[in-house]
């Protein structure tokens, strides 16, 4: 078996490990460089290494920027559009939880947060910057278009197939680490509004 993400101890298997920590670090660093310090991180359950890594990248970027990590701004929800939309309506409508930016662990979650913000009359990116993860096709369909972490999907797919073929042939293979990651900056992020 070949797994995508996570280092699983399963006999006769290997994993393609993704740069999840580095990707979330890039996303959060982009927001801090725009002047944001109150950044909400909406992620998946920490029981999975992929999401632990993404939370770790977020906290690393905050710490490097001299921003105190606020655990109340690190939330775990189901990573779906609907769950993020419902959470976003509730969270963003509470004035005491004022944030200027949101980083999410996937694009559907970012889209749900964007829709909630827009329904509450919060302007994206003028009042709230939003960054997703995975850079799926949906990032080009939102209004504004969604800034998102880009993992090289073709390279990942190629490595998965190569590893599977080697395993089928009986070869013992090490895990493959994908190190390429970038941030596709689109229209959903802007400098913090200091008004």
Please provide the spans of the model-predicted regions.
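A short, gly/pro- and small-residue-rich
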Residues: 1-8, 59, 116-127
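Flexible loop/turn connectors
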Residues: 87-195
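Conserved beta-strand scaffold positions in the cores of enzyme catalytic domains, especially
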Residues: 1-3, 13-15, 41, 74, ...
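Short beta-strand/turn micro-motifs composed of small residues
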Residues: 5, 17, 43, 76, ...
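An alpha-beta-alpha
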Residues: 27-65, 72, 176-190
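Flexible loop/hinge segments that line or gate small-molecule binding clefts
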Residues: 1-26, 108, 134-146
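Short beta->alpha junction loops
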Residues: 73-83
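Hydrophobic alpha-helical segments within soluble ligand-binding/sensing domains
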Residues: 14-41, 56, 60, 81-91, ...
